[in-house]
Design a protein with these regions (language model features):
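A short amphipathic alpha-helix within small helical-bundle interaction modules
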Residues: 4-7, 18-21, 25-32, 37-40
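Short hydrophobic alpha-helix segments
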Residues: 93-95, 150, 219
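Short loop/edge segments at beta-strand edges and connector loops
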Residues: 173-175
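A short acidic Gly-Thr/Ser loop motif
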Residues: 10, 71-76, 200-204, 222
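Short beta-strand segments
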Residues: 51, 72, 132-136, 198-204, ...
Length: 388
């Protein structure tokens, strides 16, 4: 116990315990506190005084930190993370969305997940400056209302207001792909550039746009619907009602449909059946990667076609925006190898105007699932500056 390193370790333990036990004025160290700790624990007075001082230092340091909670809300899971000012993730929490429940119960689950992240960080709720959330579907970031989230079957849900009522913490909302793009821009693949477009390929396809260092929302807050660029006029019907959208050609749902059709209607043999336990209704990105690695001809052909149309989509974005960087992310991109990215690049160059791709970097996302929570925390801090 005479080792100062040991004293520091004990101080870390006691920093929270002391305040919980009633040492409210812990930052004003006195002999009274040391004597009380001695009486409570039986340790020597000198050691008690050192522990109190170490706890004081730790509490003061924690008080000076400015924490926010970033949340990535999806149709299947909710991720929450307590994040320090420098972007360091201090704690994480995860729970199932249970989207079949009514909005009030799902919002309760979001609030519980946030509280769990705060508790895991060893912080009190009043240490959290704000909560930032990335949510699916068209939404109004100013009022914090989800206009329509098809995966949740939500219409006009005032998520910001409902969470602030439950948490008593300022809460800010933006589109999930926007916050993922911001995360990559500030702490991931996009660091050091001034303009970029994030294209995220998963169940659907979404995009986020950074221009002159700022997130671009558009006039009615719907900028970035890259999944609905038309890349094949006579292509399959998209959920939006149009035909030949990028999402209808290259999303995971589109990939699944094409593989299923090849196997069931054309009688093609594929390892996918074995790898996915015979299920052709939903094929996960990891399974696609395994099939490609195994040399599965059906999957490889479909993924080559997928890359082609993603390349055409990238070319369209570069033609009209010409950003410094295109960041490709999402489950489908993250699961596949560099050959997939190179094929996207090949078709982007082929379909872009001459020289338009010069100097435009096509990069892959670096942050994975953390992009959403980090981006949400960044936007929350920005809103704090402009709102309060």
């Amino acid at each position: 116990m005479k080792d100062l390193t040991a004293i520091k370790g004990v101080g870390e333990f006691f920093a929270k315990k002391l305040s919980q036990a009633g040492y409210q004025s812990i930052t004003n160290v006195t002999d009274v506190h040391a004597k009380r700790l001695q009486a409570d624990t039986g340790i020597p007075l000198l050691i008690a005084a050192r522990i109190i001082k170490e706890a004081q230092s730790l509490i003061a340091e924690a008080d000076s930190e400015k924490y926010v909670v970033g949340v990535d809300m999806g149709g299947t899971k909710i991720l929450a993370a307590t994040i320090a000012e420098d972007g360091t993730i201090v704690s994480r929490a995860k729970t199932a969305t249970k989207a079949h429940k009514d909005p009030a119960k799902v919002i309760d689950r979001i609030a519980d997940c946030i509280n769990t992240a705060i508790e895991k960080a060893g912080l009190e709720k009043n240490s959290i400056q704000a909560v930032g959330i990335g949510a699916p579907g068209p939404l109004d970031p100013q009022d914090g209302v989800i206009i329509f989230a098809p995966n949740l079957n939500w219409y006009n849900v005032p998520l910001k207001k409902e969470l602030e009522n439950r948490l008593n913490i300022p809460t800010f909302l933006d589109n999930d792909v926007n916050v993922g793009t911001v995360g990559e821009f500030t702490h991931g693949a996009g660091q050091g550039v001034n303009s970029l477009v994030g294209i995220f390929v998963g169940t659907g396809i979404g995009g986020g746009i950074i221009l002159n260092g700022k997130l671009f929302h558009g006039t009615n807050k719907t900028a970035g619907e890259i999944g609905h660029i038309i890349v094949k006029a006579d292509g399959p019907k998209c959920n939006c009602g149009n035909s030949g959208c990028l999402e209808a050609m290259s999303s995971r749902i589109a990939i699944t449909k094409r593989i299923r059709r090849a196997i069931l209607k054309r009688g093609k043999k594929s390892h996918i059946l074995e790898l996915n336990d015979g299920n052709l209704d939903s094929i996960r990105s990891g399974t696609l990667a395994k099939a490609v690695a195994a040399g599965d001809k059906v999957t490889i052909k479909v993924m080559r076609r997928t890359a082609k149309y993603l390349g055409i989509g990238v070319a369209s974005v570069v033609n009209f925006l010409n950003p410094e960087m295109i960041i490709l992310g999402g489950g489908v991109v993250e699961a596949l190898d560099d050959k997939f990215i190179e094929r996207i690049r090949k078709f982007a160059v082929a379909y872009a105007l001459p020289n338009t791709m010069d100097g435009v970097e096509i990069a892959t996302a670096k942050l994975g699932d953390d992009a959403g929570v980090i981006g949400a925390s960044v936007l929350a801090r920005q809103h704090l500056v402009t709102t309060y």
